[in-house]
C-alpha cells in the first residue's frame, strides 16, 4: 500500500489562482492515473471526483526495500517461527502506507487527466490532460515543491485548437508533437509539428 485516500490532503490551492487567497476542497472519491518515478523514490497520484482532479506527489520510504534482508533473522533457531515472523512482517508492510510525505501539486476543473510522467531524475513531473474542449494539453511541475513551471504553452498553442502530446524526453528537456483539433477552422499549419521544450530555460523551439 503506497497511500490511502485518507492520507491525501483535504484542501489545496489552485495554481491558476495566483493570489492564493483561498483553498478548494480536494476531489478524492477515487484514484485516477498514477506514475512511479524512475528512481522509485516518488510517485505521482491523481484523485478524482466527477470532472475535478487533484495531483499530488508521494515520497516513498526507501527502507521498505530492505524488508527481505531484515526478515531473514539469525542463523539457526526454529524455522517455523522464523517463517511466521516473515509472514507477519510482510502483512504489516502491505497494510501500512509507505509514503513518508505527500505534497500537493495542483487541482484541475473540467478536465480529464490522461498521463503523469516523471523526468529521468524525478526533478519534474509532466501532466497530460484533456481540457473542457477535449483538446490534449500539458503542464510541468517541480516534483519536490509542487511549483508550476511557467512554460507558456497556452500563448503559443491556442487551448481550443492545438493538441500537445509528449513524445520523449531527456534529463531536463522533452519533445512534443503539436497537432490541430479535428473540425476546427483557422488552423495555422506553421504551428503544428514537433518542438523541443527546455525546462530550465522555459523555452519552446520548433525542430
Model-derived features: where do they sit?
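Blade-terminus and WD-like Trp-Asp/Gly-His loop motifs, strongest in beta-propeller folds
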Residues: 32-43, 115-125, 165-175
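Surface loop/turn motifs at the tips and blade-to-blade linkers of beta-strand repeat domains
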Residues: 23-28, 105-111, 153-160
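Beta-propeller fold detector
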Residues: 4, 13-17, 66-105, 148-158, ...
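Beta-strand C-termini and the immediately following turn/loop, strongest in propeller blades
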Residues: 2-6, 44-50, 59, 126-132, ...
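Structural motif
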Residues: 3, 51-59, 66, 133-141, ...
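Acidic, small-residue rich beta-repeat scaffolds with periodic aromatic anchors
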Residues: 1-7, 159-207
Amino acid at each position: 500500500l503506497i497511500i490511502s485516500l485518507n492520507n491525501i490532503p483535504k484542501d489545496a490551492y489552485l495554481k491558476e489562482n495566483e493570489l492564493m487567497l483561498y483553498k478548494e476542497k480536494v476531489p478524492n472519491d477515487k484514484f485516477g492515473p498514477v506514475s512511479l518515478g524512475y528512481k522509485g523514490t516518488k510517485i505521482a497520484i491523481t484523485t478524482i471526483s466527477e470532472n475535478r482532479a487533484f495531483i499530488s506527489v508521494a515520497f516513498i520510504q526507501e527502507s521498505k526495500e530492505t524488508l527481505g534482508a531484515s526478515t531473514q533473522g539469525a542463523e539457526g533457531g526454529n524455522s517455523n517461527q522464523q517463517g511466521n515472523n516473515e509472514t507477519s512482517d510482510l502483512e504489516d508492510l502491505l497494510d501500512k502506507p509507505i509514503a513518508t510525505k505527500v505534497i500537493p501539486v495542483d487541482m484541475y476543473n473540467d478536465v480529464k487527466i490522461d498521463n503523469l510522467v516523471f523526468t529521468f531524475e524525478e526533478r519534474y513531473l509532466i501532466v497530460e490532460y484533456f481540457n473542457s474542449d477535449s483538446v490534449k494539453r500539458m503542464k510541468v511541475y517541480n516534483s519536490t515543491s509542487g511549483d508550476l513551471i511557467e512554460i507558456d504553452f497556452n500563448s503559443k498553442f491556442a487551448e481550443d485548437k492545438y493538441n500537445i502530446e509528449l513524445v520523449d524526453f531527456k534529463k531536463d528537456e522533452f519533445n512534443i508533437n503539436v497537432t490541430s483539433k479535428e473540425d476546427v477552422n483557422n488552423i495555422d499549419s506553421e504551428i503544428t509539428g514537433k518542438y523541443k521544450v527546455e525546462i530550465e530555460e522555459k523555452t519552446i523551439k520548433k525542430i
